[in-house]
Amino acid sequence: MRIISGTLKGRRIPFNNRKFGDARVTSDFVKEAVFGAMGPELTGKRLIDPFAGSGQIGYEAASRGAAVWLNDRDKKRHGFIRNIIQEWELADQIDLSNEDWHRWLKRLSADASLPFHLAYVDPPYDAVTPEGMPESEACLSAIADLNLLNPDGQIFVQHTRRIILPDQIGSLHQTKSKRYGDSLLSRYRLG
């Protein structure tokens, strides 16, 4: 796994997903699709990733100039990300949390100065809420309900192709969905 662009381009991320349970690694192909849609320059943009895993989406966004908020409830993955942030001296660009994703989003929503331009949602593929809703859909709904997105913001959701996300979730509308192997990458915007 490596950073594909920006100031950190070429750096290797020494993440071994066998050590971290249900964490998947986003392929360079999917990452290039996401960041191709976001654009090469992210200076002044703010990104959230409630299911950070290895942190690779956050590092890539920081490499391109974004301010980043990462969360992962798994203590081992959180520790791995914290070590990379320290080693690569990214503490001024990346805020890291270790809590339930819904509680974390609620906490972020309390700070009205932080509407986000970008969100990357990639929960464990088979994860569901206690009500039986896929966590990918529940997280999209929470982001919409908590007004966390800038009016021109966009959300990228990586999910299993077995889950078909609705065209509309609250104030969010799906603008694109493309298959990458066993994954779908769906994009949502307000409106």
Name these PLM-found stretches.
Residues 1-191:
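Class I S-adenosyl-L-methionine-dependent methyltransferase catalytic core
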